[in-house]
Amino acid sequence: MTSTIVAIPSTHPGGLDAPLGAHFGHCDLYTLVKIADGKVLDVATLPNVPHQQGGCLAPVNHLAQIGVQVLIAGGMGMRPLMGFNQVGIQVLFGNGAQTVREAVEGLLQGKLPQFTTDFTCGGGAH
């Protein structure tokens, strides 16, 4: 059984019922969901890292180092999107999901589109 670690930018305290963070780089934390065979195996949280320690790519590298394979986001700039592509993390667009649970369900149902440059923003809070 191969599992996938999915990161979802979230508001405090995180978890499946937490609201999604509007912008990946400025979220309170990431809810990490381990998925295998279409089921949630585990849920954990990971604090975000300050931008000062590596700029916009600090969160990208932080998530790559812990083995995240997929990120579901509602918003991000072009630079971090390119960074995720470079480190091999697939980025999906949250497509209006309000909670982590809704985002994960969208992923499991194949309803989340690839996060393309059409979804990028100029950065900052949403």
Locate predicted features.
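Mid-chain, well-packed structural core segment of small domains
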Residues: 60-96
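Non-catalytic interface/targeting segments
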Residues: 1-54, 86, 92, 96-126
